Amino acid sequence: MIKRVHLGQGKAEEILNLPNLIEIQLNSYEKFLQLERLKNNKPLLNEGLESVFRDVFPMKSSNGEVALEYEKYYIEYDSISFTEKECKRKGQSYEAVLKIRLNLQFLTTGEIRQKDVYMGTIPLMTDRGTFIVNGAERVIVSQIHRSPGVVFYKEKDLYYARIIPYRGSWLEFEIDSKKDYLYVKIDRKKRILVTLFLRALGLDTREKIIETFYKIRKIEVNDDTKREITGQYLATNITIKENMTYRAGDKITLQDIEDFLQNGVKEINLIDFDGYDSVPGKHFISSDVILNCFEKEDAYFALKDGFKELSRESVMLAVYSVLLPGEPISIDNAENDLRTVFFSEKRYDLGHVGRYKLSKKFGLDDLTTSVLTMTDIVNTISHLLRIYDGHDVLDDIDHLGNRRVRSVGELLTNIYKGAMSRVEKIAKDRMSNKEVFNLKPQELISVKPVVSAVKEFFATSQLSQFMDQVNPLAELTHKRRLNALGPGGLSRDRAGFEVRDVHYTHYGRMCPIETPEGPNIGLIVSLATYSKVNDYGFLETPYRKVIDGKVTDDIEYLSAIDEEKKCIAQANASVSSDGNYTDDLVSVRISGDYTTMMPKNIDYMDVSPRQLISVSSALIPFLEHNDANRALMGSNMQRQAVPLLFPQPPIVGTGMERIVAKDSGVVIKAKRPGRVVLATNKKIVIKPDNATSERDLDEYELYKYERTNQDTSFNHSVLVKNGQIVNKDEIIADGPATRYGELALGNNLLVGFIPWNGFNYEDAILISERIVKEDLYTSIHIKEFSIEVRETKLGPEKVTADIPNVSGKILSKLDENGIVRIGTYVKPGDILIGKVTPKSEGDITPEFKLLTSIFGEKAKDVKNNSLKVPHGTEGTVIDVQRITKDDVGNLPPGVDEILKVYIAKKRKLKEGDKMAGRHGNKGVVAKILPVEDMPYLADGTPLDICLNPLGVPSRMNIGQLMESQLGLAGKYLGEYYDVPVFESATNECIQEKLKKAGFNETSKAVLYDGYTGEPFENEVMVGVIYMLKLHHLVDDKMHARSTGPYSLVSQQPLGGKAQFGGQRLGEMEVWALEAYGAAHTLQELLTVKSDDMSGRVKIYENIVKGIPTNVSGIPESFNVLMQELRGLGFDLSIYDDNGNQIPLTEKEEELINKT
C-alpha cells in the first residue's frame, strides 16, 4: 500500500468521513423493497412497495359481499436461477419472484380463502447499486424535478400562484396587473374569476368571501363619520326595504349614507384595508382585487338589478362549463365532481412532500392531510395578493427547496402504483361479473399489467440507462448522477438558461462544475461529495453547529429550506484547538450573499472544503487554480480514461483516490478479519478469526478479463499472499484502473512544456517511444460477437464446419463443430462461427437445377450464413459461449441456441489517440519519437512527453503547472502527496520540496536537443504530470472502404463507419470542381462513380474486358427528383438529343418499346 504525505493547508483528518458514495442508490432501493426487514421478519414500514399494496387493498365488490384483503408480500430467494456473473454471461436478468399473500373474504358467510399470489419478478439491486437486465448492467439515474407544493412567481405582468400535487390536477391562480382581476385555472384550461370558484367551493355569498379575506371594522353612522365612510366598502349586506339591499363589497356613496340615516341604520361593518397585519395567525389582505372580481361578476352575468346575490345554479354552471367541460347531469353532480377534483383521495394526492411544503409556507402544523383543504386555497389566494401588494416576496423556482430528487425506490413505487391501479380495476370487474362463490384469490388478480410495466421501465425508460463502465470513476459518477430530463421532467428544447444555471442553494448539494458540455448542460448534474437525500427527497448537506461563537463537533444535515437566512462560515476559517475562531471577523455566507461576521453571529460552519463539489472534481489537484470551464472538462475526461495494463497511482493525488476505488465496488474487500489460506489468480480464500468451524471460510471469486459495457477489460489482480493477516474492509484485490487499492487512471510522465518542431502545435502531443515499448498506455479491449441459430420454415439452421464454397485455409481456424478455436488470432473477414441455413426452392439457380437433373441428387441446398469478423476488428479469441434452451430455459421464440465469441485486442498508444491530464488539458498524439531524439535533461534523462506551453495561458488551467512541479519533487524524493482541493499546497511548500529534490525552485531546467545535443536557448519548465489515455482511440475511428452498401433510394453510398459507409460528393464539392471547369471529371464523379446504376455495371464490364470507356447514363438521384415532381402532380418526360424519350422506370421502358 502507498503511504501518502498530506500537503494541504488544513488538517489531514476530516471532521466527518465521506458517506458511502453510492448510498443514494442502495438506501433508496432498500426503502422500496425493505429486504433487511423481510430477512429479519420485522414488521414492514408503510412505504415503497408495502405502501402500494396497502393503498390498493382491501378491494370490495360492488355489492359488498366479497372483500380481497392483503396480508404481506415476500421475495422468493430460491427463484433466483443465476448468479450475477451467470446473468451477464447468459444474457439473463438478475431478479427474484415477488408473491403477495391475499385473503378472499365472503362477508355473508364469513369464509376466508388464503393464497400466495404470484406478482411477477422484480429485478434485484446488486451490492454495487446496479441492476442486471438481459445480461447488461444498468443504472437507474435519480431524477430532479419540480417539488409538489405551492409556488409563487411572476412572468411579464402576471403574478402566479401554482399548487402542484404529487398526483392530480394542477391549480393555478393568476393576477393580471393591468386589469387588477384574480383568475383561477385548473390543469391550464380556460381561466375563470376566483370569486366564482370560491362560491362553487362553498363560500357562496359575498359576505362569506369578504369575511374570509378581509379584516372587518364596525363604525357608527352619523354626521361626524360621513366623510370617513364615503368611498369605503361594505363588509356585510344591509337591507333597508324589502326589495332594497346594499351588498357586501359595494362602494358607499354619500347618497347611501343619507339612506342609512333615514332608515335608522346606526352601525355598519366596513372592510379594514389597513388592518391586514393586526390579527396574529390571520393572513388578511389589503388589496381590492377581490372586490374588482365582484364587479366583473356582475358584468359577466349582466345583473341589472344591483341588489341580487348570484344563484348557486348559475355559479355552478359557469364554473363547470369552463373547468370540466361537457354538460353536467345536475347541479348536485356538478358540485360533487368539482369537489372530488381536489378533495378526494382517489383523484388527488399532495404527497407527504406537498403537504410539508404547504404547511411550511403557511405556518401550519398539519403534516398528514394528503388532499387540499379550503384553508390551503384561502391561504394561497391571500399570500398571492399580499405579494401583489408588496407585503411578501416571490419564490425562486430554481431554489433547491422547490426541486426534489426522485431516486430508484420512488420511481419504482410510482411504476407499481400505476400498474396496481389497473390490476384493481380488473379485479373489481371480475368480482362483480363471475360466480362469486367459486372464486379463488389468484383468479381475481391479473399479473400482466405489473409484469409489463416493470419490464418496460427497466428496458426502455429514459432514466434506466446502460451503465457507463469505462472505468470505476465513470461507474460511480453514473450512479450519483441527477437528471432533470425524463418522464415528468424538463425537455432539452424548452429548458431555459435559469434552470441550467448554478444557484446558491447548490452549495454542498449539487456540483457546480461537473455537467456535460452540449445541449444537456446544467440539466444533468452530479451529487456533491457529502450530499444526501432526505425523507422528503430534498438534498441535504452537513454542517458543524456553532454555539455562541464556538465550533462544536455536532453535525447537522440541512436542506436548502432549513439553510435559508442562516449564517454559515467556510470550512477553512481559522479555528483554535478549543473551537474558538481566531479572527474577529469571519468570512461567511447568508443565503446567496457573502460577507464577514463576528463569531457570535455564526450559526454553522462547513464540514470540509470539498463539500461543494462532486467526486470527479474532487480528484483534480490544485482545482482552485484552474478556470471553471477547464475543470469541467477535466472532471468529464477522467470518466473517459481507459483502464491500462500497468497503471500507476498519481504522485500528486487529492486523498479521494482510495475512497473512490473502495466505494466503486471494483476492488475486493475482506468481509471479516482473518488469515489468507489460498491466493490464486482465480480466487482468494480467507479463514476468518471468528470462524465457527473448519469449513467457515470466506471465498472471493476474481473476474479475469471480463468484458464491460464499453468493451474495456475488467480484471482483478491479487494484492495478498498466502498466510497474510488481513483486517476487515482491507483491499485484497485490485480491479480495473486501480493500483494498491487506489484509483489509478493513467501514468506519471516526465513532461517538458516546449514546442518541438511544430509537432505539438495546437494541442497536439509529442511522446517518447519508451512509453509505447514499456506498455505504459497499453489497454485491453474485448468485443463480443453473437449469432442466433434459428428454426426456419425450411428446417433448422446448423452450426458446422462444412460450409459450401469456402476454402480450406479459411476453415483452418475452426474446430470440427465449426466454432473458432480459443487462442486463435483472427482478422477482418475470418469466419468465427460456421452456420448454414436451408435454401428455399426459389433461391436455386438454373445451373443448380441442371446439375440436379443430371446427377439426380440435390446439390448443396444450403447457404452460408456464418458469423464473420467485421471490418476494422482483429484480435485473439479468448472465449466462446454456447447458450441453449437447457441452459436458460427461455430463449427468444424460434431461436435454438445463441453463440457468443469474445475477441480481445491489446492496443498500444499510437498516433491519433487522445490523451488528457486532469485539468482539461487534452490533445491528440501527433508523433511518437525515438527515445534518443527526445529532448533530455542535463543528466541525460529524456523527456516522456512534450506539451505546448501555449496551451496554458489562454486556458487558464495553472493547476497542471503546479501539479508538474510537485510531481517532479515527488518522483525524485520517492514520495506520494495528498493535495486536497481548496486547501492545496502553497507555492512556498512546493518550492521547498523542489529544493529538497535538488531542483531549481521554478522547476525550470536546461534541456538539450536530442537531434543535435545542443542546449535549447531558454530554460524549459520540466515536471511530472499525470496523463490519461481516453476512450477515443484512433483504431475505433479509422475507416476505409472501396465498395460497400448503397442507399436503396438514392443509390449513393451510406455514411459512417457503423454502416461501412463511404464519402459523399456533396453540393459544395461540386461547386469546387465547377470552379475549376473540370467538366469531365465532374461528370464521371456524379454518374458512374456514384449513382448511375447502368453506367456502373457497364464501366466494370469495360474495365474487365480492357476496352477504353466513356459511358455515363442518368444518375439515380435525378430519377428520384423526377418521381418527387411527379408525386406533386407534374407530368414530366425526358428526351435525348435526338428527341427520343428516355424511360425512367421498367414500366415506361415496356410502354416505349411497344409504341
Curated annotation (Swiss-Prot):
Keywords: DNA-directed RNA polymerase, Nucleotidyltransferase, Transcription, Transferase. It catalyses: RNA(n) + a ribonucleoside 5'-triphosphate = RNA(n+1) + diphosphate. It holds the Pfam family RNA_pol_Rpb2_1. The keyword Mitochondrion does not apply. PROSITE patterns: RNA_POL_BETA. Its EC number is 2.7.7.6. GO terms for biological process: DNA-templated transcription. GO terms for cellular component: DNA-directed RNA polymerase complex. The keyword Magnesium does not apply. Gene3D superfamilies: 2.40.50.100, 2.40.50.150, 3.90.1100.10, DNA-directed RNA polymerase, beta subunit, external 1 domain, DNA-directed RNA polymerase, subunit 2, domain 6, RNA polymerase alpha subunit dimerisation domain, RNA polymerase Rpb2, domain 2. GO terms for molecular function: DNA binding; DNA-directed RNA polymerase activity; ribonucleoside binding. CDD domains: RNA_pol_B_RPB2 (cd00653). DNA-dependent RNA polymerase catalyzes the transcription of DNA into RNA using the four ribonucleoside triphosphates as substrates. PANTHER family: DNA-DIRECTED RNA POLYMERASE I SUBUNIT 2. The RNAP catalytic core consists of 2 alpha, 1 beta, 1 beta' and 1 omega subunit. When a sigma factor is associated with the core the holoenzyme is formed, which can initiate transcription. Belongs to the RNA polymerase beta chain family. This is DNA-directed RNA polymerase subunit beta. It comes from Borrelia duttonii (strain Ly).
